[in-house]
Each structure stands twice: as C-alpha cells, then as structure tokens.
A protein has these predicted regions:
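Generic secondary-structure signature for well-ordered alpha-helical cores
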Residues: 23, 27, 40, 44, ...
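Cytosolic regulatory modules rich in charged/polar residues
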Residues: 29, 101-118, 168-169, 197-200, ...
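C-terminal ends of transmembrane helices
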Residues: 105-109, 153-164, 210-223
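Core alpha-helical transmembrane segments of integral membrane proteins
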Residues: 115-188
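Generic detector of multi-pass transmembrane helix bundles and their immediately adjacent loops
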Residues: 187-251
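Alpha-helical transmembrane segments and their cytosolic membrane-interface
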Residues: 74-142, 229-240, 248
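Soluble N-terminal domains of membrane-associated systems
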Residues: 1-97
Length: 251
C-alpha cells in the first residue's frame, strides 16, 4: 500500500499537468512529453500517454498497472499557464519539487485564471485589427473605423459566446455584426475600401493558433489530433466566411 500511494499521486500530477497544457493551447506532443518526464522523475520508468484535443489517456506498466482517462471539454489560449506548467515540470525533473508540493502548485494554477481583463482584450483586438488593415495595404484613413469595428466585433464575440455555448454560432453571428458594421461605415462615408475594412476587422477571430498546432501535430505524426484541430480551425474559418457572405449577399 505504501508503494501504491505515491504512484496514484504521481498519476494525478501527470494528468493535471497534461490537462492544463492541453486546455490552454499547448501542442499534443508537449502534453505527452511533459507527462512522461514527470512520471519518470517520480520513479515510474515505463508510462504511456495518448492525447487528443478532447481527452488524455495515461497508463503505467509494472506489477500494478494503472490506466486513467481525463476528458477535456473546454479549450482556450493562455500561454502563460502553459509556461508555468513547463516551469513546474522542469523543477520536478531536476528533483527540486516533491510530489505533494508539485500537485499543490498545479492545483493552485488550475484555480487561477491568469487572464487579462476583457477591456484589455477588446483594446488589443481593436489595435490588431487596425494594424492588419495597414498590413493588407489598406488606407490610413480607414484605421480608426477598423479600430472601432474590430473592437466592437471582438466584444460582441465575448458576449455572444457566453449566451451561445456553441463557439461556431458565436463566431458566425460576430462575423455578421462585423460585416454589417463595415458595410454601414462605407455607406455613411466613414470608410473607403470595404474589403480591407472587413479583412482587418475579422482578423482577431482567425484561428491562427489552431492552424499552427494542427500542422505541427500532423508533422509530428499525431494524425488524430492534427486532423481534429484542423477541422476545428476549418469550422471557425467557415463560420467567419459564412457570416461575411451573408451580409455581402444583401449589400
């Protein structure tokens, strides 16, 4: 019984670390590598992990084989949390953290949000929209218009995502709002190039991280995860395109 308890705690640490990385935008290979390194550092020499965007399976070999499953229902992007889990993992590998302290630090990390306030997110999205306008050869005279539309669009997405749990529909409705606002701005003479205004305003919604992770997982041989993330990115892009097309069909 004395040998079993540390193994149970180690498995909890591995699963919690993997869950935090996967939930906050980490790659599949990083999750598997982190879990295996933690297990090895705490004396589990042979362990196996299977990770997909919606779940983690972790198993150990030996006299008492143990298999655990954790389901991932929500995913976001918080690279600070990923970095903090990596720091904890490195301390574990160096022998600087006992199992109890590591588990407590991971639980504290799970309970804290470490997110910017929504005002900062909206301002960042608005600034990014304006910069993308210039990057795509837009006019400086449209910068303020795109700044406002991009900010309003991202704020609408945050609010709609609370009301509509399905992210696809929230993105679709947000794209409609952005398309309608852009068309209205051009109609009122507040903007010049409709296409550049729309492109700049929707860029904060584009799933760049999902596309990057999908390609990275496919290149690493994680076909299930790569295709899943690629499909999620495709649905997001389709929702944005469908929303804009809906508005332009009436323009």
């Amino acid at each position: 019984m004395q040998n079993q308890e540390p193994s149970q705690l180690t498995i909890k640490i591995c699963l919690l670390a993997g869950k935090l990385i996967l939930q906050n935008g980490g790659e599949t290979y990083r999750v598997e590598d982190t879990m295996n390194r933690i297990a090895y550092a705490y004396g589990i020499e042979s362990s196996h992990s299977y990770v997909t965007p919606t779940g983690i399976i972790f198993a150990t070999d030996g006299a008492s084989q143990i298999t655990r499953l954790v389901r991932i229902s929500e995913r976001s992007t918080n690279l600070l949390k990923v970095s903090m889990v990596n720091d904890i993992s490195r301390k574990i590998s160096k022998g600087e953290l006992c199992a109890e302290d590591a588990y407590r630090q991971l639980k504290d990390l799970e309970e804290k949000s470490y997110e910017y306030r929504e005002l900062y997110k909206v301002l960042a999205a608005a600034a990014a929209s304006g910069c993308f306008l210039i990057m795509f050869d837009g006019k400086w005279s449209d910068f303020l218009t795109v700044f406002l539309i991009g900010g309003v669009g991202f704020l609408s997405f945050l609010m709609l995502h609370r009301l509509v749990p399905v992210k696809f529909f929230a993105e679709f409705l947000t794209a409609i709002i952005i398309g309608a606002s852009s068309s209205l701005a051009v109609y009122l003479g507040l903007g010049g190039e409709l296409d550049k205004i729309i492109i700049g305003s929707v860029m904060p919604l584009v799933p760049g991280l999902h596309i990057t992770n999908a390609v990275r997982d496919l290149m690493a041989g994680h076909l299930v995860s790569g295709l899943s993330k690629g499909a999620e990115a495709f649905l997001t892009a389709f929702a944005i395109g469908a929303g804009i097309a809906t508005v332009l069909s009436f323009y």
